[in-house]
Amino acid sequence: IKGLQCIVDIDDALHLGVKQAALNVTLDQLVNWRADSGRFSRQIDGETVYFHSDYVEHIDSQLKRLTDAGVVNSLIIYNRIPGSRVGSPLVHPYTDLAKSPFHVGAFNLATEEGVRMYRGAIEFLADRYSNPRREHGLAKRFIIGNEIQSHWHWYNLGEMPHRQVVEEYHRALRVAHLAAHSIHPGIQLFISLDHHWSAQMGENTLHGMSGKYFVETLNTIAKAEGNFDWHVAFHPYPENLFNPRTWEDTAATPSFDAAKITFKNIEMLPAFLRHKRFLHNGKARRVILSEQGFHS
């Protein structure tokens, strides 16, 4: 099945025969946290969360065309921090605004206002884009964050121990699950992982962890607090991002302890998730390949 992410030209995508698409939704562009009025809003615990109308209309225009063409759509929901966000309830208090390499931070589930804004955003997206009438387009896959095990780069929580990172992310994932399923129980929630499996990106253990540790720890925490149906959006980039010959990947071995999982050994991921301890109601977690490519 042919898929495309970060679609620039929908006509081109449809001419390519794309059947699946992943669209980025950035929380800071969606939530108008300074507003006290607006066209788009949602009530959360007696408070009103407002949304930027131009951004909502932008999502509508993309999703509607793709949906009408029969494309299955996913939303990648993440927290971009393009500049200073002093006072923003969207920014996690542990996010290192100055040093975040790619200006992508964690969702703020540490304050009451942050939870309200985040929950409002998820409920709004679920309500608008899971409606069977498909008036604004259809997207029933929500990918929460980006490449979480390499959090320093793509879900910045500052310098933080592994277990605490997973606990923080679990909170965001569970709130998203509860919020989305309060609107439509058919929405699927996905975690996001890069190709590092038993290895981690870089050497600083406060900047990242292995994908295997992240999945195992998330599963343990989720089961302890009440299991739910999360799934995996995986990025099977080649071992060397500048070498598309993935069959030459030496770190992608046929083992559950492989340093990396790429297209060469991609079968290891669904096989690992079929272990009994990862099942939910007797069913294995779904795996989608939501991002992959090559540098040039």
For the regions a language model picked out, list residue spans one by one.
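Noncatalytic carbohydrate-binding groove/subsite architecture in carbohydrate-active enzymes
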Residues: 69, 115-127, 132, 138, ...
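N-terminal substrate-binding region of glycoside hydrolase catalytic domains
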Residues: 1-130, 134-137, 141-144, 148-161, ...
